[in-house]
Regions:
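Bacterial Sec-dependent N-terminal signal peptides
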Residues: 1-27
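Extracytoplasmic/secretory N-terminal segments
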Residues: 22-180
């Protein structure tokens, strides 16, 4: 009896560990676009309270009030609307011909059913890289310590002054602890 209990407890611990690990791996990954998103969108990333849509040379941030969504789901909220906001960051004069690639494919996938088609086996990736967003400058987007980060990789003999980012739709913009 003791051995059975120890085995059961061990299996339960293993199951919980695998479940938590699978959950953490599926969070914050780049979803490929196989037709379930608008053509201009290369990848979508779910973040707490919204999503980020990545296009060539542009990020579109879309956020909603998570508490209101939960209240609507729980049939507590009477209003038919949810507070939401979108804004964008566009890399001005970026090269439209740049190559975008996803790397480190996960085993996780989703299927989508739109009004026009069924999209199967949509995969998720850990990293997105846009080569030559500017001449000699690459953009790499990834997660670090549970935060979405991006690096602009400036290759030798490249001009960093090419980089110009225009923000649109936000209420205000400021630096806090040297972060935007």
């Amino acid at each position: 009896m003791k051995n059975t209990r120890e085995i059961s407890l061990g299996l339960l611990t293993l199951f919980i560990s695998i479940s938590l690990n699978s959950f953490s791996q599926s969070q914050f990954q780049f979803q490929e676009n196989k037709g379930q998103l608008p053509n201009s969108v290369f990848s979508k990333v779910k973040v707490p309270g919204g999503s980020i849509f990545i296009e060539k040379g542009k990020f579109l941030y879309s956020f909603y009030n998570s508490k209101q969504v939960q209240e609507k789901h729980d049939l507590i909220r009477k209003e038919d609307w949810i507070d939401a906001h979108s804004f964008s960051a566009k890399f001005l004069n970026s090269l439209g011909s740049s190559e975008i690639k996803l790397s480190e494919k996960s085993n996780y996938f989703e299927n989508f059913y739109t009004s026009k088609m069924q999209v199967d086996d949509v995969r998720f990736y850990k990293e997105l890289e846009q080569k030559n967003i500017y001449q000699g400058i690459d953009l790499k987007i990834y997660y670090s310590e549970n935060n979405l980060k991006y690096d602009l990789i400036i290759h030798p003999n490249s001009n960093e002054r090419q980089i110009r980012i225009k923000y649109a739709g936000q209420d205000n913009i400021f630096l806090k602890n040297k972060n935007l």
